[in-house]
Design a protein with these regions (language model features):
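Intrinsic disorder/low-complexity segments
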Residues: 1-24
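Glycine-centered small-residue hotspots that permit tight backbone geometry or close packing
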Residues: 17, 274-276
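Acidic/glycine-rich phosphate/pyrophosphate-binding loops and surrounding catalytic core
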Residues: 25-242, 252, 258-263, 269-271, ...
Length: 313
């Protein structure tokens, strides 16, 4: 499973360089997600909002018609609820892309838990640029902080030594960001995609003719990491004997999970998955499983309530 990424530092002025990194003047602040191009994401998001390539598109008609070109704003972003923060450096990148001279101070560490009313970011710069970037920046930080906040709720509810995992149930195109947000909430990443581990599920088992046969096919193909999903206790030993390196226990109740953990006996990691809720995760984790995976972290997280207010300078 992937480890927690480095987080941007506190109280930094940020901008976006040509490599998609967040920077503070001449000092580079690491914000690199393998496989994710920050500069491309920011540009594509702004292009979508501005209607680049569409008839009549390519501009913010409201700001251009109402706000003087040389007007400057001060901006203040704050939390309206208690949240776990994720995505502030990405939000900052939207503003600096449109106004490279914008002064931005990120006040809170990524992954920090903050109460309602906490100042998150301060900005000073071109008013049109702020207004044009506002929605893209807020959408991103609200979405990612919402995921981080829900994830932290599940981590806190576990009350055990088990580790919370996310899943591949992410919005297309946003997987790297959403999985980053779950890490900021205290979870670890499950597979990033179809490429980094085999996960044998019921359809694979049906075609192969059984759990052992499916695992053996993956082993023969040279796959090193083989996660095998089982939904019955009597499938576990067959999966282990065939060489599974991780057993996923699908939709089992706590009694079945305890039995499965005893049978696996620490030979490989065990994972409980399926139908996990805040009210049930403590009992599930108490069975001794290594991991508990929850699709709702990225499927069902509500946006965090984060506001951004501007004042003319």
């Amino acid at each position: 499973m992937s480890s927690k990424a480095e987080t941007p530092e506190r109280s930094v002025s940020t901008s976006l360089d040509t490599n998609g990194q967040v920077c503070n003047g001449s000092e580079m602040i690491p914000f690199t997600l393998p496989g994710f191009d920050l500069a491309r994401f920011v540009r594509a998001t702004l292009d979508e909002d501005l209607g680049i390539g569409l008839p009549g598109g390519g501009r913010d008609v409201t700001s251009e018609s109402v706000i003087p070109a040389d007007m400057r704003f001060a901006g203040a972003m704050d939390s309206r609820d208690a949240i776990t923060v994720a995505g502030l450096p990405i939000a900052a990148a939207f503003f600096r892309t449109l106004d490279p001279a914008m002064e931005i101070e990120v006040l809170i560490d990524e992954g920090a838990q903050v109460p309602a009313g906490t100042d998150l970011m301060r900005l000073s710069g071109n008013a049109r640029a702020m207004l044009t970037a506002e929605r893209s920046a807020l959408n991103t930080v609200q979405h990612l902080s919402g995921i981080a906040t829900l994830t932290r709720s599940y981590v806190d509810a576990m009350q055990s030594n088990s580790t919370l995992l996310d899943t591949r149930k992410t919005i297309p195109g946003l997987r790297h960001l959403e999985k980053y947000a779950t890490r900021m909430g205290g979870a670890q990443n499950h597979r990033m995609g179809l490429w980094d581990a085999a996960m044998i599920k019921d359809n694979h088992v049906a075609v192969a003719g059984g759990v052992a046969e499916a695992v053996q096919r993956a082993k023969t193909a040279g796959v090193r990491s083989i996660i095998c999903e089982v939904d019955r206790i009597d499938q576990i030993e067959a999966a282990l004997s065939a060489g599974a390196s991780h057993i996923l226990l699908d939709n089992m109740n706590p009694g079945q999970l305890s039995q499965a953990v005893a049978l696996i006996a620490g030979r490989v990691p065990s994972e409980a998955s399926g139908g996990v809720r805040l009210g049930t995760i403590a009992a599930i984790a108490a069975t001794g499983v290594t991991y508990v995976s929850v699709g709702r972290l990225t499927q069902s997280a509500p946006a965090a309530d984060i506001g951004l207010d501007f004042t003319p300078l």
